[in-house]
């Protein structure tokens, strides 16, 4: 990507975030085009893409035959097909898997590094963008297209916007917002996704979890009414036979080091500590607080105490902005 990422600064929690423009270089874009693109994606992902309108974006999982996620995708309609956003670390292997059956269909599947991904969040984000676009997305219309630009709206953890655009528009937005907005890199958007409870699947955790272990059913990312797709049998079994015993949790507190994706944590059991869970992502905020997204058993006590392995500091459970009740 020729567009240069902004220099990093410590991320801030959504409640205190000033107006911020972010380069989302840790995320990546991919597309599918061609006459069979809808039918093809319908047979590959957990969401019902046939029901998707131009005004929607959806979270979906792309699974292996055992129902384990290669990746999760933020999907939207793009041209005569679809585009999706995923973590850059998993894009190449995910596209390799997606292309396996493409030879039999009229589709072209490709990485897209021509377009630039930007995020806008923080204080009065909507007002800042209102001067630059004739229409902004909202709850009723979550995707808006204008010229070379697609804008995606997110409600949680606080209103924010993801912008998919060309380099010229990205430069224009940066020039226009530079004076009033702080500039930051992907870590700030990652912190907001952790706060929102959107699962972050990086390479270390690809092929490890069924979608429900990362709360995808609570985020509208799984259709249990659609036809066949890869891994469907295992995903359905987890729902109808209660086979899933895991959930995605948000932890906050302090730690002397950030746990890495794929690492476990420790749970306090009386005087002892027991290893538990798998970290998906973690970020240290500017106030020193550490936030961790972790997959653990879904029956954790709300007052449980955790720590990064052998650390002197502790982490506790924070509420997510959605319910896991079926």
Swiss-Prot record:
GO terms for biological process: iron-sulfur cluster assembly; RNA modification; tRNA processing. It is found in: Cytoplasm. InterPro entries: GCV_T_N, GcvT/YgfZ_C, tRNA-modifying_YgfZ, YgfZ/GcvT, YgfZ/GcvT_CS, YgfZ_barrel. It comes from the Bacteria. GO terms for cellular component: cytoplasm. Keywords: Cytoplasm, Folate-binding, tRNA processing. The keyword Cytoplasm applies. Coiled coil: none annotated. The keyword Disulfide bond does not apply. Folate binds at residues 27, 189. One of its GO terms (molecular function) is folic acid binding. It holds the Pfam family YgfZ_barrel. PANTHER family: TRANSFERASE CAF17, MITOCHONDRIAL-RELATED. Belongs to the tRNA-modifying YgfZ family. Folate-binding protein involved in regulating the level of ATP-DnaA and in the modification of some tRNAs. It is probably a key factor in regulatory networks that act via tRNA modification, such as initiation of chromosomal replication. This is tRNA-modifying protein YgfZ.
């Amino acid at each position: 990507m020729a567009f240069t990422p902004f220099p990093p600064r410590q991320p801030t929690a959504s409640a205190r975030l000033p107006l911020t423009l972010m380069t989302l270089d840790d995320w990546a874009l991919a597309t599918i085009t061609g006459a069979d693109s809808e039918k093809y994606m319908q047979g590959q992902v957990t969401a019902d893409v046939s029901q998707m309108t131009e005004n929607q974006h959806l979270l979906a999982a792309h699974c292996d035959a055992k129902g384990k996620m290669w990746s999760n995708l933020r999907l939207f309609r793009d041209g005569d097909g679809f585009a999706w956003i995923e973590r850059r670390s998993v894009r190449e292997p995910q596209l390799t898997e997606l292309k396996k059956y493409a030879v039999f269909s009229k589709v072209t599947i490709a990485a897209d590094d021509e377009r630039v991904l930007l995020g806008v969040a923080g204080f009065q984000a909507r007002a800042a963008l209102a001067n630059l676009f004739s229409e902004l997305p909202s709850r009723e219309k979550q995707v808006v297209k204008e010229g070379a630009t697609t804008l995606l709206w997110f409600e949680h953890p606080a209103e924010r916007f993801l912008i998919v655009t060309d380099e010229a528009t990205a430069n224009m937005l940066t020039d226009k917002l530079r004076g009033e907005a702080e500039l930051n890199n992907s870590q700030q958007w990652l912190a907001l996704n952790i706060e929102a409870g959107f699962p972050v699947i990086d390479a270390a955790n690809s092929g490890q979890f069924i979608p429900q272990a990362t709360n995808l059913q609570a985020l509208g990312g799984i259709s249990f009414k659609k036809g066949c797709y890869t891994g469907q049998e295992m995903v359905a079994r987890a729902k109808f036979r209660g086979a899933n015993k895991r959930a995605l949790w948000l932890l906050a507190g302090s730690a002397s080091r950030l746990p890495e994706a794929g690492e476990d944590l420790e749970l306090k059991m009386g005087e002892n500590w027991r290893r538990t869970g798998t970290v998906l992502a973690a970020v240290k905020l500017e106030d020193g607080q550490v936030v961790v997204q972790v997959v653990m058993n879904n029956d954790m006590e709300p007052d449980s105490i955790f720590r990064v392995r052998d650390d002197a500091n502790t982490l506790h459970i924070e509420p997510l902005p959605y319910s896991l009740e079926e």
